[in-house]
Design a protein with these regions (language model features):
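Long, low-complexity or tandemly repetitive, helically biased scaffold regions used
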Residues: 2-173
Length: 173
């Protein structure tokens, strides 16, 4: 659903912000492709860096969406489609990184200290990504590969839950 605002933005401002969003997604793509996920202090920090950067992208996407949805002169389908494509690309990247990291966790015989926090964060992240991708505006930009990655991520989460069901204990301690 479009975010309606009394403020109208010049197209050049929306485009400038969209370019910044696309650049951040490109930078995060490079960062993620250079990251080798293993479990240990340094790798966890590296993944935390990825998560922080993806959070910044999400925040910027809110700002960009407000501008794209409230242009002076009315809607611009090309700009809106470009924004929607960027959102899908960001979600694809986040799901891919989550998959890589969860795969590492699922292969461990014993989960590391703090695994509950990591796991619950990944579960939230996967859920949020899936919910964002359910926006009908994004459907034209979602391919079968992304749908498959979401299914794989859910399977990996199931493996982790089966390996350590205590991670999902929600009773008061």
């Amino acid at each position: 659903m479009a975010v309606k605002s009394k403020i109208k933005y010049p197209q050049r401002e929306a485009l400038r912000m969209l370019l910044a969003l696309e650049q951040q997604i490109d930078d995060l793509t490079a960062f993620e492709s250079e990251t080798e996920y293993t479990v240990g202090a340094l790798s966890t920090d590296r993944y935390a860096q990825f998560r922080a950067k993806s959070g910044e992208i999400y925040t910027l996407s809110i700002v960009v969406k407000t501008r794209v949805d409230n242009l002076q002169g009315g809607p611009d389908k090309e700009l809106a489609d470009r924004f929607d494509r960027s959102v899908v690309n960001a979600q694809r990247l986040i799901i891919q990184a989550s998959l890589r990291f969860m795969d590492v966790l699922s292969k461990l015989d014993v989960l590391p200290l703090g695994a509950r926090e990591i796991f619950t964060g990944e579960l939230r992240s996967l859920y949020d990504a899936r919910e964002r991708l359910r926006d009908p505006r994004l459907a034209p930009f979602i391919d079968d590969g992304l749908e498959k990655k979401i299914g794989v991520a859910e399977a990996v989460l199931t493996t982790i839950i089966e390996k350590a069901p205590q991670l999902m204990s929600f009773t008061a301690a």
